[in-house]
Amino acid sequence: MGSSSANKKHASTSSAPSNDVRAPHADTNRLLNDMAPQLMTPAMMNAMARISLQSTPIATTRDPFPLQRATLLLAPRFSMENPARSLARISSSLLQFSGLSKHSKSGREQQRTPITSMDVGVLEESQRILATADADLDASLDTSLLDDDNDTSDVAAAADAPVSLFRGYKATVPQVSTSKTRRRQLQASENIRRSKHEPHLLSLQELEVQDRDMLAERRNLEIRRALYHAEIVHVDAKIAALEATKASLQQKLLHVREEELELDDERQGVSELLELQRHRRAMPGGRGLDAGTVLPIGAGSSRWRKTPVFLPSEHDDLPHGIAFMSLNLETGPITALDFSEPYGTLISAALEDTVRVWDLSTGEDVGRLRGHTDTVKCLQVEDELCVSGSLDSTLRVWDLRRVDAFETACRARMEGDGQDVPEADDPCIRTLAGHSRGITALAFDHETLVSGAADKTLRQWDLETSQCVLTMDILWAMSNPSTSVDLRVPLESSAPLLDPLHGANQFAGPFSYPQPPYEDGSWEMYTDFVGSVQFWGFALASGSGDGGVRLWDLRTGQAHRTLLGHTAPITCLQFDDTHLISGSLDKTIRVWDLRSGHVLETLHYDYPVTALQFDSRKIIAAAGACAVDVYNRTSEKHSSLIKHGHTAPVERLRYMDRYAVTGGRDSCIKVWSL
C-alpha cells in the first residue's frame, strides 16, 4: 500500500511538469494531431524513414545530443520543390529522437518508449521552424494580400511567392472547420458558465485570441487560394503545351496527306504509262516502241487530267512561290494563254495583238500565229496542236511544228527576197466557221472540239472534217427547265441576281454585265455570255452569263442538269470524276458534288474571279487582285503568289503540277514555281 501510494505520488509529481511543459505548445500539439492520421501511419513512416536513410544516414545508436541533432536535421529551409525529402527529414527526426524508432538490440526489436522530455524538445524545435516559416512567408508575400479590394492582384502575387512545405501543409490541412468547431464550443462553454441574466460578452483577451485565430485562418485561406491558383496556372501551361503539340502533329498530318495525294497522282501517271507500254508492245511491230514516243488516240487531254508532269530536276532548285520568269508584251491586257508542258511551248494572246508563241525553256518569242482579224479570247494547246477562238467568230487550228519554218520564210520575205511564203508552211491547218458572233470559250481533245460563243450556242466540231456535228442552244435550255434543271438541287436563301429558270427573255439581245471593280479600281462591261466549257467523253459542262452551270450529254445534245447558286455570270470552271469547281463575277468559287449536285464548299474573295484551275491538292485562282490565290484543299488555307509578280490584276492562268503561268492587265506573263 505504501509503495503503491508512493508510486502514484511519484507519477503525479512527474506528470505535472510534463503537462506544464506541454501547455505552451497546445497549438503545436493540435497541428501534429491533425497531421498524425496522414503522416504517422506505419507505411508512411517506414517509407519516409527509408528515403531519409538514403539521403542522410542516421546512426544506429542513440545520439547523445538529441536536440542539437534535431536542429541540424530540421534547420534546412523546407519548400514545396521537394516535399518528400522534407517530410522524410521530419519523420526521421521524430522517429529517432522521440523514441518511436525501432533499433535492433540483441536480435530483438526495442519496444516503443513513453513520451519524454526529448519529445518536448522536438516539438519545440518544430514550433520554431513553423514560426520561422510563417515569418519568411509573411515577408515574401505582399502586405496587400489581405486587402479584399485587390483579390485578383493578391492571388497573382501570392502565386509567384515561394511557399514553404510546413506553411503550405499547415494551410492546406482542413483546420478551418476544426477552428470553427473549437470557437463554437468555447462560446457554448462560456454561455453555460454565465447565468441567463448576464450579458453574453467575451472578454478582451478572448476576443483577441479569436481575432488572431481568424487572422491566421484568413492567411491560410489566402495561401490555399494562391496554391490552387498556381496549380491552375501550371495546368494551363501544360494544356497550352499539349495544344501546341497537337497543332504541330496536325500540321505534320496535313503534310503527310499532301504527300499521299502527290504520290497517288504520280502513281496514276506511272500506271497509265505502264498500260500504254504494254499496249504498244502487244501491237504488231511495237516491240521497239517506247511509251513516251506518242500518245494513243483518245488518251485524254493533259489540260484537265490530274496526273502530274514529271518536271526537270532543276525545277526543284527554284524558290517556291516566286516568279522566276517574266515575259513582257507591252501591247495590252492578256486575254488568253496556255502551254503544252512545263518548259515547253507557251501560246499567248493579248488585246489588239496577234497570237504569240514562246519557248518557256529560254523565254524567247519564237513567232506569231497570224490569221485572226479580231482579239483572241480563248485558246488551248495539246502537244503540237493549238486551237484559238476569236471575236471574229472563227476557230483556227494551228500546227506548232510549222512555226519556225513559217517565221523564217516571213523574215526572208520582209528582207526583200520577194518570194511568197509557201502555203504548206502556214501553221494554220484548219479554219472553222459557224458561229454568228464572237467565240469566248473552247475545249478540244484530239478529234473533238466544243466551242461557246456570244450567239448563246454551244457547237461540237469534228476536227477531221472541220464540220459542226451538234449545236446546243442555251436559251432553249433556259426556256425548258423541266429538261435542263435538276429540281432536287436546293436553291440558296438569297435568290440569284440572274434567274436562269425564268429569265431567258432577258438574254435574247446582246449580253452585257457590269463587272465589279478590281483591286486597282478598274472595271468594264462583261460581254462573254459563255464563260467556260469543258468536256470529258460524252459529258460536257458549260458556265454562262445567266449564272448557271449546265451539264450536257453530247450524245443527245440535251442539258440534263443545271447547278444553281452563283448570282453573277460564270467566268471559269473545271471538273474531274467527282467534283466541279466554278468561278464567277459574284466573287466566289464553288465546289460542287457531281453525284448529288450540292455545294460542298464556297470560297469567298474580295474581287471577281476570272480564272481558276485545280488538282487533288490545290485550287489556283485569279480573283481580281495582283496576287494569285493558292488554296490548299487539305489544310483549307490560302496563300498568295505575289513576289516578283504582277503590278495589275491577274485575269488568266494555267497550272500544271508545280508549274503555273499567269497573265495580267499589266501586259506581262509570269512563270511561277509552286
Swiss-Prot record:
According to its record, how does it sit in the membrane? Peripheral membrane protein
Q: Which residues form a coiled coil?
A: 202-260
* UniProt xrefs under SUPFAM superfamilies: WD40 repeat-like
Transmembrane as UniProt keyword: no
Question: Keyword Ribosomal protein on this protein?
Answer: no
Q: What is its main location?
A: mitochondrion
Disordered as annotated region, ranges: 1-25
Q: Where is the composition biased (Polar residues)?
A: 1-18
Pfam families for this protein:
WD40
* Domain of life assignment: Eukaryota
- What does the UniProt function comment say about this protein? Involved in mitochondrial fission. Acts as an adapter protein required to form mitochondrial fission complexes. Formation of these complexes is required to promote constriction and fission of the mitochondrial compartment at a late step in mitochondrial division.
Record protein name field: Mitochondrial division protein 1
